[in-house]
């Protein structure tokens, strides 16, 4: 059975959280922070789709000239090839105001308890969009895909997930993951298992190594980047870690590992008898 990285993340946070969510199927309510983060991701996905839309006609013209040859070229590689020829996606349609409008269309307000809190979150999102636009405008960008799904084999397991944004750079492929949480340290980014999985996914999708993994943290104070790479040995270690976690899942090892940090973020802390908070 395929497993998403979010399932691996829940198990790593606490095996009981995984058990409640994926084995016992106990529902949980989405928090205001999760709702806000989801709205930000939707807005940036639509922004990336707007970028891609500006190149669709040109890509179609060039691939049509390839005739029957294009049938043997994967769609992902065609998009990457397109990125090699179009480094600058900035145009009159890609403005800060258009991004704000996309945010208004993407923002989900009904998870907030009051209209005041919803309005505050909406205005906060506007500021985050401005911060993102300032970051985005710094250099020409060539987006290859947004919210790109993947499915890769890790030993006997299938692991699925989505890449927030993929860009083509002069060096190769850059994977960008958006965050609305507090920034992690550089050491945490360098050791992050999710980013290692993303590097494996990029190599699978494009038949070439990922040259940069970038965590982009969006906050009221601005944007914070955590850029990292993965070596062959790190990718091998990531495969081993994921397989070991899968084996523990299959062995039904759901012994809880409570901690203040994990329990504070757990949606099941109200029903768990060993919750640390």
Predicted regions and their residues:
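Solvent-exposed, amphipathic alpha-helical segments
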Residues: 39-50, 244, 248
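Polybasic (Lys/Arg-rich)
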Residues: 234-267
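Short cysteine clusters
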Residues: 14, 263-266, 272
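C-terminal, charged and often intrinsically disordered regions of DNA end-processing helicases
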Residues: 1-34
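Short cysteine/histidine-rich zinc-coordinating motifs and their immediately flanking basic loops
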Residues: 275-277
């Amino acid at each position: 059975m395929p497993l998403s990285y979010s399932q691996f993340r829940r198990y790593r946070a606490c095996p009981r959280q995984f058990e409640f969510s994926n084995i016992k199927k106990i529902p949980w309510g989405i928090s205001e922070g999760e709702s806000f983060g989801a709205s930000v991701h939707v807005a940036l996905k639509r922004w990336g789709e707007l970028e891609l839309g500006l190149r669709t006609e040109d890509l179609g013209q060039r691939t049509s000239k390839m005739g029957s040859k294009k049938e043997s070229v994967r769609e992902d590689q065609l998009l990457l090839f397109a990125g090699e020829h179009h480094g600058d996606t900035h145009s009159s349609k890609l403005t800060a105001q258009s991004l704000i409008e996309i945010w208004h269309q993407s923002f989900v307000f009904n998870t907030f308890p009051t209209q005041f809190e919803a309005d505050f979150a909406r205005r906060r999102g506007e500021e985050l969009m401005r911060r993102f636009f300032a970051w985005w405008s710094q250099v020409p960008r060539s987006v290859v895909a947004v919210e790109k799904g993947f499915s890769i084999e890790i030993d006997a397991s299938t692991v699925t997930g989505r890449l927030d944004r993929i860009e083509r750079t002069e060096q190769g492929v850059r994977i960008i993951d958006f965050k609305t949480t507090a920034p992690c340290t550089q050491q945490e980014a360098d050791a992050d298992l999710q980013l290692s999985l993303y590097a494996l996914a990029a190599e699978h999708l494009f038949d070439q190594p990922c040259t940069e993994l970038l965590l982009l943290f969006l906050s009221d104070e601005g944007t914070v980047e955590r850029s990292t790479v993965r070596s062959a040995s790190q990718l091998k270690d990531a495969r081993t870690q994921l397989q070991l976690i899968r084996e523990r899942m299959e062995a039904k090892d759901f012994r809880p590992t409570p901690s203040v940090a994990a329990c504070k973020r757990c949606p099941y802390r109200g029903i768990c008898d060993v919750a640390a908070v």
